[in-house]
């Protein structure tokens, strides 16, 4: 198992799905990084703030969020719990210096917070960038033969997906704060129905980390997969066109460098 090689790590996750082996993959991307660092994080309709850095960009309703350090420490503590948790089959993706806005110092900061490198640490970008075409063409088709739950934005048109969803847990804007109750909803649904062998897809920003941590910790007989915005072009959502280079590269043939970016463990 080589989770530090961008392509081999994808193969490892893909083969687990093919073989119906249960696992969890949870992503600690730049947003989670800033929350762990206790920085103010804001994605608004026309601008962003990350600590002392701010700028202009377009964020549609499904992408908007805000973490206020003075108000939201509970959610930071839960995110830290999820990040520090180690368990067989619990794979955690972190930021690397391949993303220039992250830098090597933040990669090293995450490793230090974690207590050092670990076999279960891999890339937060594992399913995107140069691996994204494989997600669409190799991984997503496997969902058609499985029982699926989906944590997704209420604006998503789930009917457009090329596979069936047994149940959708709808979330809204700033779901990591406003929809924390969904963690218990997912957990209770799994427990009540004694589910085994399901795939739980999560497209819910930092709420995905909470759901995956709390549910997999108690029941590792299902697979939990943080897919971020990977399916957004199929869901009648528009925000990805402004903020997701790997998606515009694949779906719109845009000349974004993210479409061919191979992340490196450094």
Language-model regions: role of each:
Residues 199-203:
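Short catalytic-loop micro-motif centered on adjacent basic/acidic residues
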Residues 207-266:
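C-terminal functional extensions of proteins
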Residues 8-10, 74-79, 181-191, 207-209:
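A short, acidic, amphipathic alpha-helical segment used as a generic capping/interface helix at domain edges
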Residues 43, 182-187, 238-246:
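Short, surface-exposed amphipathic charged segments that create phosphate/polyanion-binding patches used
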Residues 1-163:
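Electropositive, gly/pro-rich neighborhoods at or near active sites that engage anionic ligands
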Residues 52-57, 168-175, 225-231:
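A generic structural motif
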Residues 32, 205-207:
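Short beta->alpha connector loops
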